[in-house]
Structures are given as C-alpha cells and as structure tokens.
C-alpha cells in the first residue's frame, strides 16, 4: 500500500461528568489497585493539527452526534469500561467526559454516528465481540453518497491497541489520554471525498455521476474487493459554483485489475465518475490513488491503463480525491491530486493551474501549480461588506503571474459578513463586460 499522509477526523473529549453514560465494568476489581480517572481528548483531526467537531455548518463533514467508547484489557480481552452518548448537540464543538479505569494495558475502541449504537453494542462483553462488530459489512446510508446532515453524520471509528494506563488522576484532575503518544484520539470517516471542479466549459455540462461505488463499509479497513455496487450517483453541485461533490466507501481493487481489464464491461470494481455534456458526449474518468507526478504527464492514459505502469484503483477511506477538469469541444483535460480532508482550517480552492487558499486570519494566497500561458488572470471579488486591505472600497484584486510556483497574498477583511454568507468569489479569466458570469469558487464565512 502506498504511503500517504493519514488524514483523520477528530473530536475533543474533555471533562464532562454529567454527559452520556459511562461506567467501569471490570468483573473482578482489584482493591489493591487504585482507580484511574482518564481525560480522553479526541478531536475531528487533520494532519495539520487544527481539529474540530461540529464546526462545518455547510456540508456537516465533521458532524458527530453520537459516540461510543469501549475499553478492553489487552491481555484477557475482558471489557473494563464503556461510554455512550447519543445526543451530542450540533453546537457542541467541545464534547467532554471522563472514564474510570484500573491501571494496566488497555485496548480502546471509538465508534461514532452508527444508528442505534448503544443497543447494537449491548451484547459486546469482550474484545472478540468488539472485533466482530467492527468487521461487519454495513450498507452505507444512500444519503451519504451525496452529503452528511446535521442529524446523520458520516460513520467514523478508531482503535488504539495496547495503551498503557498508569496510576494517577482524580475525578477533578484526570490524567490526559494520549493514544500512541498523540494528544488526540483521531476518528476516521469510513468514506472518501470526491471533489470535481470544472474550470472550463461548465456551460456545456449536463451532469456528473459517480459509478461503481461500494454498497458496503466496515469500521476497520477493508481487505477484500466490493461485491455490490451503488449508483450511478449524481454528484451534488455546491451552490452556483463550478464544484461538484460526492462520497464513496473504501473500495479495494486487486493490482491484477485495471481499466479495461476487470473482466466486465462496467469496469467493476473500479470507481469512476462520468461527465455528460449537453451535446450528449460522455467522458469516463477512473478514480485512482497515486502520489507524485503522473507517468507520461497526462492523467487519462495512465488512469485508463494504457501505459506500462498501472495505477492503484483502490479508494481509501478518509482521503480527499480532487479533480480539475477542462471540457473542450472533443476531449477533456484532467488534473488530479490527493490531499488531507480538512474541514475548518485553511479553505482551499484548486483551480486549473493555480490554488487559492484562505487561512483563519483572512490571508488569501494565490499560487501557480504549473507554468501558465496568457491569458492567466485570477480575479478575487470581496462580497457582502468584505474588502481587501484597509479600505472598504477595495473589493477586487487580480493575480497575473505566469511562472510555476509564483505566489501572492492578499488580506481580506470579512468582519462585517454574516456567518453563512459569501465573502469571497474567485473568477478565472473573467469577461468583465459579460453579465451573469458564475464564479469558479465561492468562499463562505463559517
């Protein structure tokens, strides 16, 4: 398996004694061993360390509304503690509880957003039962191919084995739980994110569909190929932007299979998306997992198995697959990347040949990702009371550098913009005299 950065989804759990339902369940408590009060600090985490839960009010990608934690003795497999909460509010960005344990080696299991979770887990009495629960194949809720909602977040899980619980901590000053030496428990979504951006030719596009998506997911990484498929799933357009989103469960594809060599006309089990133009043209784009430069420099010949080097078609959970596409009269051009599935921190748009990133301080950075040719104008327009620099009348800026790696940063002030409203629009090579021009990207204040 390729080594890619792990992207996780986290959840802050601090001291909240009156929340949820938890108890120690050691069947033979040792009176010589003192109780340990453990502070579990888990976040909807990303590799950049800026984690959150329940802060994404647009797509609810970080929504956690129910959580279970079960703890087992690493040697005997007996359950020694558990915690359940089925009603974490949407405004709860810090969810808090403690757990009481005895010292020793412990295995921690975390599960989030599973329907009727406490009832389903009531019969779990040892680690063998828990492993079975984690390995069961479940059907993904059909809505999760399109989005999560406030009341129906993506299923998530995480397991930490052989964690040392040491003596110490009190009910008022619990010890921090640092799994594998990290400060946070990091939950993983069971789905990957598909992000398709049409950077040219959107006016000719009829629809984008995800094909061959896996029906099933597990709470631990899959080990076998999908056997049932869902869809096609029409991707969801983000407002009036040129961005389409969808989500897909993890799908293992054996290395002996590639596009056109799967043994069936539908190319199952390979995930792909299909673009259909208003003129009836259809383009199929296989989804691959590949780090680094694309062999040959062109995505489609490599992704369709036309080169000696074959890609991996396995889709991994909690990854963000990003495509930037130009639709031309008789073909399409595809740019591809995989990145961390971040929610709350830097908001980034990947255009064709450039990126636009906005950090929490309002610094807007435009960076070229390739050598560009004229015309290459990235125009930023501040909206709804936002402005650039220190003058409220400065509501637009442009970036025209051509060199690969060229970059420029602008400061946008969005203090006057209401939460949930647009504060920045991105246009690429806009016709300033045209009416009804749709922005390539709209940034929303969170």
From Swiss-Prot:
It comes from the Bacteria. Keywords: Cell outer membrane, Fimbrium, Lipoprotein, Membrane, Palmitate, Signal, Virulence. Its main location: other. Transmembrane segments: none annotated. Tip subunit of the minor fimbriae. These filamentous pili are attached to the cell surface; they mediate biofilm formation, adhesion onto host cells and onto other bacteria that are part of the oral microbiome. They play an important role in invasion of periodontal tissues and are recognized as major virulence factors. Fimbrium subunits from different strains have highly divergent sequences, and this correlates with pathogenicity. The name (minor fimbrium subunit) does not indicate the abundance of the protein, but is derived from the greater length of the major fimbriae. In strain ATCC 33277 and strain ATCC BAA-1703 / FDC 381, major fimbriae are 300 - 1600 nM in length and about 5 nm in diameter. In contrast, minor fimbriae are only about 80 - 120 nm long. This length difference is observed only in a small number of strains, including strain ATCC 33277 and strain ATCC BAA-1703 / FDC 381, and is due to a loss of function mutation in FimB, a protein that restricts fimbrial length in other strains. This is Minor fimbrium tip subunit Mfa3. It comes from Porphyromonas gingivalis (strain ATCC 33277 / DSM 20709 / CIP 103683 / JCM 12257 / NCTC 11834 / 2561).
């Amino acid at each position: 398996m390729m080594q890619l950065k792990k992207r996780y989804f986290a959840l802050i759990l601090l001291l909240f004694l009156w929340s949820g339902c938890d108890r120690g369940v050691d069947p033979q408590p040792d009176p010589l061993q003192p109780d340990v009060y453990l502070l579990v600090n888990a976040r909807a985490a990303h590799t950049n360390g800026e984690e959150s839960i329940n802060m994404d009010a647009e797509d609810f990608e970080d929504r956690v509304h129910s959580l279970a934690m079960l703890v087992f003795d690493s040697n005997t497999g007996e359950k020694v503690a558990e915690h359940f909460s089925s009603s974490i509010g949407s405004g709860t960005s810090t969810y808090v509880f403690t757990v009481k344990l005895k010292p020793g080696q412990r295995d921690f299991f975390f599960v989030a957003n599973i329907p009727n979770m406490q009832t389903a887990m009531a019969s779990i009495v040892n680690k063998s039962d828990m492993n079975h629960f984690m390995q069961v194949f479940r059907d993904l809720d059909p809505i999760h191919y399109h989005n999560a909602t406030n009341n129906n977040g993506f299923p998530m899980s995480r397991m930490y084995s052989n964690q040392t619980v040491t003596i110490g901590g009190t009910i008022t000053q619990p010890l921090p739980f640092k799994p594998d030496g990290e400060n946070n428990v990091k939950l993983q979504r069971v789905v990957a994110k598909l992000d398709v951006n049409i950077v040219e030719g959107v006016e000719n596009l009829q629809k984008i569909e995800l094909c061959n998506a896996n029906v099933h997911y597990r709470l631990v990484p899959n080990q076998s190929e999908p056997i049932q498929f869902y869809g096609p799933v029409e991707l969801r357009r983000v407002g009036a932007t040129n961005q389409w989103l969808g989500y897909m469960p993890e799908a293992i594809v054996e290395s002996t299979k590639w596009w056109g060599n799967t043994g069936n006309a539908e190319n199952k089990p390979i995930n792909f998306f299909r673009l259909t133009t208003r003129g009836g043209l259809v383009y199929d784009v296989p989804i691959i997992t590949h780090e680094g430069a694309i062999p040959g420099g062109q995505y489609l010949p490599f992704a369709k198995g036309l080169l000696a080097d074959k890609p991996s078609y396995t889709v991994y959970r909690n990854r963000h697959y990003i495509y930037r596409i130009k639709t031309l009269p008789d073909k399409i051009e595809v740019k591809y990347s995989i990145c961390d599935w971040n929610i709350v921190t830097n908001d980034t748009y990947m255009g064709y040949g450039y990126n636009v990133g906005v950090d929490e301080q309002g610094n807007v950075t435009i960076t070229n990702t390739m050598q560009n040719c004229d015309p290459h104008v990235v125009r930023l327009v501040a909206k709804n009371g936002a402005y650039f620099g220190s003058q409220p009348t400065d509501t637009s800026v442009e970036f025209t550098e051509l060199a690969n790696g060229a970059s420029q940063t602008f400061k946008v002030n969005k203090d006057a913009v209401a939460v949930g409203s647009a504060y920045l629009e991105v246009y690429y090579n806009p016709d300033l005299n045209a009416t009804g021009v749709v922005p390539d990207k709209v940034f929303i204040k969170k």
